[in-house]
């Protein structure tokens, strides 16, 4: 299960990380977020070279605002601390995997 991070440790966990990080911006009340969660869990188990983290937009408004999160779920791919890709809304597993793999 991806680690939950927030305003206090986003920089260390994502921006200072070398390699690929998938950040799942979500909220506990969001239906599509609940649907995508098990897919993210599966991908984390399959893709050992990628770091997966989750940010609750209600608990971490600073990070959500910094990255312009308007709708959830929003998935952001970071590589070596740079935001290289973003998708909004529910996607099937294979599309999320392809999104990540193009930055590996």
Regions found by a protein language model. Give the residues of each.
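Proteins that catalyze or organize thiol-disulfide redox chemistry
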Residues: 1-51, 58-104
């Amino acid at each position: 299960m991806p680690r939950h991070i927030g305003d206090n440790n986003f920089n260390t966990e994502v921006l200072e990380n070398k390699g690929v990080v998938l950040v799942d911006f979500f909220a506990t009340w969001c239906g599509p977020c609940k649907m995508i969660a098990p897919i993210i869990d599966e991908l984390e188990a399959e893709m050992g070279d990628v770091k997966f983290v989750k940010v609750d937009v209600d608990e971490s408004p600073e990070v959500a605002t910094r990255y312009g999160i308007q709708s959830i779920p929003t998935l952001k791919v970071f590589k070596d601390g740079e935001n290289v890709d973003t998708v909004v809304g529910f996607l099937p597993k294979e599309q999320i995997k392809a999104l990540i793999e193009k930055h590996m």
